[in-house]
Amino acid sequence: MTTAEFAVAALIAHGIETVYALPGVHNDPLFDALFKAGKRVRTIHTRHEQGAAYMALGAALATGKPQTYAVVPGPGLLNSSAALLTAYGMNAPVLALVGQIPQAAIGRGFGHLHEIRDQAGIISRLVDFSARIREPNEAAPLIAQALRAMASGRPGPAVLECAMDVWGRTAPARSIEAALPAPAPPLDENAIEDAARRLGASQRPLIIVGGGAQDAAAEVSELSRVLQAPVLAYRRGRGVLDSRNPLSITLPLGRELWREADVVLAVGTRLFSGFTQWGIDAELAIIRVDADPEEPERFARPAVALIGDAKPILRRLAQLVPGEERASRHAELEARQAMMRARLAKLAPQAGFLEAIRAELPEDGIFVDEVTQIGFAARLLFPVYAPRTFLSPGYQDNLGWGFATALGAAHARRDVPVVSIAGDGGFLFASNELATAVHHRIALTVVVFNDGAFGNVRRIQEEQYGNRVIASDLSNPDFVRYAQSFGAEAERARNPQELRSALRRAFKQREAPTLIEVPVGPMPSPWEFIQMPRVRGHG
């Protein structure tokens, strides 16, 4: 077997069903091995390396399972690096297989095709686990090691590189078996009991959830019910608690409740807004639940740190929390939500379009946001009913991530509709992947809100820089004809009612992408509801 065949056999043994990729001479033996694997693993080729990497990211976010992409070295790796950074920031299990120049030439500066100075060093700054496959018998063990690292502690991406001549080297064939997952760390019963006592004695508890809570939705719901604690989610935590639950809240009301809270239980979240914007003081006890032992003390030492998988920790907390059944806070929170909705009414243009999307998207459909005015508002206003159905780019918040990421989600979850929202600026970062969607018959709906500008940048220039507008106005194609030229379905919607009708038609497509262009003007700023000042203590 060749090194590449060992690698593909290892991917299959570990349940990898798809490799998102863009081929090139450095990886020719790898693609030959993928061909020989037949239907056991599918190769989805894209039109740009960032498309392959973002598709793997979208598939990982939508399924919670590890995904793989393959690219050539040097420019191929660097073209995919924005997606790799985003995967790191979102703790997404994405494995990159990256080619290399001939092994004997690595680090010698000969000027080989796609040579890059210290590629391994660059990779090591982007991910926590990386390695080079140096001979055939290393391929399967290193893939197993990488996948194990990606799932241990804080999840995240990994990179394996392999020289072009090593991919084709051979060794005696042998069977490949999946490696056992890393054992879960034992629960710290003393710390859990301490946390349970604090929660049981609390008068105004608040739960904040991030992406690390997505697989503990039932446990979050039960603990929230027992404590009558509101659950705040922003971006990746959306959907952990169904938005229809009166205890489910978003950022603006969360800040008010942060000011009142005596105990905050933070589950799988960096707690960035609380520590850096809203402030802390001696009266606030913070309990951190995180898979990463370094995370709880990154900003400040918590009252209690619970390290491990959120699911068993929260289940145990719910069992141990003392005290009598608490009075319902549903009526109180519903009233406060209504007051907050009145304040958020200034975002009516965005809200109208988001309501149209929510009305047509099934409960289990997937919504992929973008760094655009509709996307910012969606993080505050869009109802989300289940984990992994609201995909948002985390702290990288990188423009242009959305369409290709949604394409990966749509490929991995062909059983549900997927809608990508984009601005005219961000969409053109990866709009060439319409060709990928058509070629592979992926039914994705993208809604392009066209205001003829990098709208957020333009508003900042108008409001904060004396209307000195520069480099923010855009000249765009006819998006409908542009999409149709790829073979996609396309139409234009001018208001929320027309958008609903267009979405209804789009979601009936099961083997073709659809683009819906929505011409819009400038929209009201959401930032007063996102970057909110301190409400207690010190930041």
Regions found by a protein language model. Name each.
Residues 1-321, 360-363, 436, 443-446, ...:
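N-terminal alpha/beta PP-like core and its mobile active-site loop of ThDP/TPP-dependent enzymes
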Residues 3-8, 12-14, 22-25, 30-35, ...:
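Active-site diphosphate/adenylate-binding microenvironment
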Residues 24, 50, 269, 311, ...:
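Alpha-helix N-cap/helix-start capping motif
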Residues 49, 161, 370, 433, ...:
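Acidic-residue sensor for enzyme active/binding pockets
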Residues 137, 173-175, 202, 283-371, ...:
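Phosphate/pyrophosphate-binding active-site segments
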Residues 164-166, 373, 520:
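Active-site-proximal loop/turn and secondary-structure-junction residues that shape catalytic pockets
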